């Protein structure tokens, strides 16, 4: 089990996760601002 975890490239996973969050968060923030008429 530890060998399997060691073989995982955590840096790549972290980068992919970061990119995914940015891609999802971008439109989400725009949608929230539009939904609230730009009022924070």
Swiss-Prot record:
Pfam families named in the record: PSII_Ycf12 (PF05969)
Q: Which domain of life is it from?
A: Bacteria
The membrane spanning regions, by residue number, are 12-32
Any one Gene Ontology BP term: photosynthesis
> Among its keywords, does the record have Transmembrane?
yes
Assigned keywords, A-Z: Membrane, Photosynthesis, Photosystem II, Thylakoid, Transmembrane, Transmembrane helix
Q: An example Gene Ontology cellular component term from the record?
A: plasma membrane-derived thylakoid membrane
Family of this protein: Belongs to the Psb30/Ycf12 family.
The function of this protein is: A core subunit of photosystem II (PSII), probably helps stabilize the reaction center.
Q: Mind telling me what this protein is named?
A: Photosystem II reaction center protein Psb30
Q: Native species of this protein?
A: Nostoc sp. (strain PCC 7120 / SAG 25.82 / UTEX 2576)
Organism lineage string: Bacteria, Bacillati, Cyanobacteriota, Cyanophyceae, Nostocales
């Amino acid at each position: 089990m530890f060998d399997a975890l060691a073989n995982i490239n955590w840096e790549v996973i972290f980068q992919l996760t970061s990119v995914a969050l940015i891609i999802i968060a971008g439109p989400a923030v725009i949608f929230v601002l539009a939904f609230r008429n730009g009022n924070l």
